[in-house]
Amino acid sequence: MVNPLDSVNPSHALFEGFVQAQTCKETQQNFTELCRHLQVDPKDYKHFYSKLKDRLNYWKAKDLWQKIDKRAAHPDYDQGKACHQNKCLVLGAGPCGLRTAIELALLGAQVVVLEKRSSFTRNNVLHLWPFTIKDLLNLGAKKFYGRFCSGSIHHISIRQLQLILLKVALFLGVEVHTGVAFEGLNEPSGSAGWRANVSPKSHPVADFQFDVFISAGGGKYVPDGFKIKELRGKLAIGITANFVNRHTKQEAQVQEISGVARIYNQQFFQALQSEIGVDLENIVYYKDDTHYFVMTAKKASLLKKGVIKQDFSDADKLLAPSNVNQEALQDYAFEACDFSTEHLLPNLEFAKNHKGQADVAMFDFTCMQRAESASLVKERNGKRLLIGLVGDSLVEPFWPLGTGIARGFLGAFDAAWMVRSWGKGVQPMEVLAERESVYQLLSQTTPENTSKNYMAYSIDPSTRYPNINLSSIKPRQVKRLYEAEEQESKPNKLKKPDIKAKPRKDSMKRLEELLSWCQKNTVGYEHVKVKDLSESWRSGLALCALIHSFRPELVDMSALDEYNIIKNNKLAFDLMEKEFGITPIMRPGDMMTCGKIDQLSMVVYLTQIRNALTEKDTPAAQSNTLSLSRKRSAVAFLNTLKRNSLQRHKDRLASVKGPRQQNMKEKEEKKDVKEESLSSETSACEPCYFCKKHLYVVERESAEGKFFHRSCFNCFQCGSTLRQGGYSFHSDNGRFYCELHSLAEEEEGDEGHGGAQNHTENGSKEDKNGETTAASSPPAHLSIKRKGSYKISVDPDFDESTEFPAPDQDEPPDLEESHQPPKPSELSAENTNMENQQHNINPVPAPRGSRAPLPKPRTVHNVVHEPCNIPEEAEQIPEEPKPKPSLRKLQQSEEEKVDLLSQDSDSETRGSSSAASTSSSSKQHEEEGYWSGGTTWGKSHREQRNRPCIRRKSEPPLPLTGHSQHGKMRSKFSPWNLSSPRLQQRFSVHRVPAGQSQPDQYVSEDDNEDDEDEDEEDLQAEHYLDCEGADFEFSDSEKRNLKRMKTLERKAKMTEIQRFHKAQSIQRRLEEIEVTFKELEEKGVELERALRGETGTGDPEIIDQWIELVQEKNNLLSEESDLMVASRQLELEDKQSMLEMELRRYMEMDDSEKSPEQQKHEAEILQEMLDVVDMRDSLVAFLEEKRLKEVNDQFNSSLDAKRRSTTASQVHWE
């Protein structure tokens, strides 16, 4: 508290004390003294701000008044008269509650805020979207908190944000009462209106009457009348930890971690687990008033470390305070935080919470809640009350997505717009309808799909949400949200859903329609006669006929033998899986040996086939399954990519072993024959491959010819959940692995068993091009010129089956022979072509130029001044006989190697094959705010261009030894290096000689003056300069360069954060799908048992329910496939970043300093990096081709419909 006698002008000193106050109590006390000294009454809310501004004539306050005046002058507020007759009660003085109160005060309403706590103690740090930063700056945040957003990552602690908003709210005449608990609403009685039931009862606010109530008190304070929807995922345990920030230089130099996710950075978490026993899903580190860490921990790890005393299936019991060892929790958090910052933070000490205890907490966010509606109106005794929700009460955020404050502020603006309409006398039903129309968009909002004109943001939703329809929901649809008096007297009867199937005349109609469709599309084929849904399909010819009927180029019916049942079914199953993503329901041998074909299995399989083959004939506006099969076929392609990647690794290991590889190949072939013979003896009702328990059709999953429960599909090494498109299979031991443990197991097996595992994952896999490889002599190399102008010598039989020309490739590969990779569709037909053929294709055309380019991530690059050539001797392929080459010989100039590194490793192919997809499942989960292929990841084309660079000061190269690659390397395990390797280098200011100027080539096209204006005050920040204790005078050009450098770094960090949020969104949605799958399978098993007569209730009517459930499961599979494609793109992007970082370190070393071992390791890194680039290019080309197919199918479908309508309308004259 400031003593007025200490200053010449006491009001100035009081104002300074108020602005600089760092606690809620101090802020309120200084504000009270300031008002008393200036003789202004805060309760005179209509005139308080104008009187305060007139009486406080202080130059430091003028800038703040200008900002507030500019905001208040917006037409939406109608000069503070829009709601001048309304009285509003806001529950909760959190950021969202205070932000709502500010808007209501600007509208002219009398606003009272209730807060149960007496102090602001939450040190947790919030991520800020760009518009929230601009919004807070416009409210004067920089005046109240000088370090606001001065770093490269935009964030602020909850406590500081509350203080900023509290001070603005007090200036605008908002009454804020702390230490007052809200206990409910008191309905009107007599002449009294709506009031609040509070504790203590004697508090004056208990007499406050209001007609608007805004709940911003969190999920626990949702008023009666609102229905809550719960989104369940797998058990998710979060841990937050705050450490004391002493603001030393050593602490300032520690890099923040904007987000590391296991979904694309498994090596970091593997090191964390192996070294200290801490098993996490993700971790974030922000630096603010405290060192703030937040992470998601695995239950098994917490139990093992003694953090959780006893295991319970119920999350509340599991995380109850009595079941948590606080000391063990502190140790767990300390070890994780210390390891993730590489032990660079000195003297880590926990900050204290409001109870004086260590500020470390564990919480459950397994279930996310959101309100089904955002508002309602209650009418009692002729008096109406408008109730709205904001903040966590409205939508509980998933913390790794960083959406809490952004969507919270958007919801606050939307609520203020609703109150504005209420104050202007709009009919209640219309107010509710418009509010719900806006609410439908809130959970979908991202920084990408909201308006970029942040300066134009206001409470009007049209300034924030592009193409919004404020009348999408009609007043008649929100009648339930208006509670009148007469409704209360009626009993609230809820209709229970009738879960029993109702008898219908067409109970078997679905089966008959399916059979009729099969007969229609197989009629006329020789030796094919479909009479039922079981035995007619035994030979496999009927399945091949179905495929040929729609895709004749895939099957040569004349080459099929009616009696070769296994071959026919294998061909059909393979084509269905690779072309349409439909996994087989049984082995080819089962179709020949089983006594009776299982009808339910065939119904499931044929239903998927019909959906896949007929989806292109369905109009886009009516189809719910458009492109579902193509999404799933993309996952089949991912499996091919992963198999080829693993095969290349095996071949490189095998090339060292030499002659024994041929022996291993022969043994493998014998094993394949044995496995095929064994499979033919298996019945269709075989048990789960893993647990050996009974496997019902509805719960059957398959991979690599194995059938199993979905819940049993886990990595053999670590037990992590595996999914289609994200596993590796070792055929020698029949085990499935995640990618992280697949290569490790391969290398260990090769060392321990003499190369016993150097073969493909699937023993029956043939060479993609149908070529045989001579083992006697190595073939001549081919010279290929790749993008980035680097040349690669490659053996002609090198397995390039999954590589395609990139969509934007300007010139074809310079091949000495015309060896071109096949199309994705031709990959699927490999078993069809029994002869050796070469497939000639044209490059995939680039997408239309009308598609908006994505913002360029990671725009800050380093220029390597003296790149060195890799000696060819380091990469010579052994001359001993081998089936395939181990490494491609590299012939690169200095410029070519620099060009290779200048290619950005970030993914600009955020799309998937579903860019134009309108599947119902995608739409459903867009509403929940999770990742959707049609929005955030809609761009499926990678624009190739070199990135601009910033010169970095020269540094001595770090010593790299052969041993270091097996130990703990920063480039391998450091999360920030993996996420954004270029930005971790320290920058220095280079003096520009007189008369010269630096080109502005590194300025991204979306830079603007607004970004630079806010950077002016932060130029001297120690965070950005490499000047230790020096006093610098910057020239104008240097200031411009530093501001732009800072802007680039900040934007690159934002891109990094967005990538983390996308990874977490994918992970969260995958976990929710997993829970939904389990529920569907449980229902499906009950129905299937009833259909098979196991429960004695074999009602044929249940078949409809069962088929609907199977269709719902198929839709989830399609969504999961889309997510896996996006996950794979992130994974490859991150892997390239890691390899690029390691390669740069070698290139910065002089050739003379490199040992032979280092040269060899450099060559291996470069080879692996090229493999990753190939895989990314292949995936891009595949997805682009799929997208073009979808566009073409939709176009042809619309043309056909137009032709039919034109033909029907023609008049024929006799």
Swiss-Prot record:
Q: Which residues form the bMERB domain?
A: 1053-1199
Provide GO CC annotations from the record.
cytoplasm; cytoskeleton; cytosol; endosome membrane; midbody
Q: List the catalytic activities from the record.
A: L-methionyl-[F-actin] + NADPH + O2 + H(+) = L-methionyl-(R)-S-oxide-[F-actin] + NADP(+) + H2O; NADPH + O2 + H(+) = H2O2 + NADP(+)
What the entry lists under CDD domains is as follows: CH_MICAL_EHBP-like, LIM_Mical
Return one GO MF term: oxidoreductase activity, acting on paired donors, with incorporation or reduction of molecular oxygen, NAD(P)H as one donor, and incorporation of one atom of oxygen
Q: Where does Zn(2+) 1 bind?
A: 688, 691, 709, 712
Q: Where does Zn(2+) 2 bind?
A: 715, 718, 738, 741
**Can you give the residue ranges of the Calponin-homology (CH) domain?**
508-614
- UniProt-annotated stretches for the region Disordered: 484-505, 649-676, 747-1019, 1194-1214
Q: Where is the LIM zinc-binding domain?
A: 686-748
Q: Which residues bind FAD?
A: 96, 115-117, 122-124, 182, 292, 392
The name this protein carries in UniProt is [F-actin]-monooxygenase mical1
Where does this protein come from, organism-wise? Danio rerio (Zebrafish)
